[in-house]
Amino acid sequence: MATMHDKITLQLPAKPEYVSLGRLSLSGIASRAGFSYEAIEDLKIAVSEAITNSVKHAFKGEDDGEITVEYLIYEDKLEVRVSDNGTSFDLETRKQEIGPYEVGEDAEMMRIGGLGLFLIETLMDDVKLYYDEGVSVVMTKYINEKQVEENAKSIST
């Protein structure tokens, strides 16, 4: 089991204007952890989608919601937890309602909903959803060891 080195927690109001704060924090944390530029871009998209989902769906535009974003830094991975205490949902039921996306499907004709979670699952190495008082999305991205070595060599002390 990997040892956690650091844990950083953000408490964000459930408002669209704070999505960028979660994304920018992640960018700095992932860079410091040794992720490549491409991996950081994937992480930023996934975290933005998770926070946006909480803003849009958990609180339905109400101003009193709060989203917790936790960044857990391990020696070989970064785990990001986006949690809210808003309205929960059942993922499997939602997937059945919207149906599968087909390769080559016209983007103009796609059903609304589910695409954010699809993106998150595509961009991250592991994604888990937990339903308790709201929804928690736990996303994991592993650090490429070669990239960590290259970054370490380029840092001067």
Swiss-Prot record:
Entry EC number(s): 2.7.11.1
Molecular-function GO terms, alphabetical: ATP binding; protein serine kinase activity; protein serine/threonine kinase activity; sigma factor antagonist activity
Catalytic activity of the protein: L-seryl-[protein] + ATP = O-phospho-L-seryl-[protein] + ADP + H(+); L-threonyl-[protein] + ATP = O-phospho-L-threonyl-[protein] + ADP + H(+)
The UniProt record lists the keyword Cytoplasm: no
Keyword check for Transferase: yes
Origin superkingdom: Bacteria
Alphabetized UniProt keyword annotations: ATP-binding, Kinase, Nucleotide-binding, Serine/threonine-protein kinase, Transferase
EC category: transferase
Pfam families: HATPase_c_2
Task performed by this protein: Negative regulator of sigma-B activity. Phosphorylates and inactivates its specific antagonist protein, RsbV. Upon phosphorylation of RsbV, RsbW is released and binds to sigma-B, thereby blocking its ability to form an RNA polymerase holoenzyme (E-sigma-B).
UniProt record similarity statement: Belongs to the anti-sigma-factor family.
Protein name according to UniProt: Serine-protein kinase RsbW
Organism the protein comes from: Listeria monocytogenes serotype 4a (strain HCC23)
Gene for this chain: rsbW
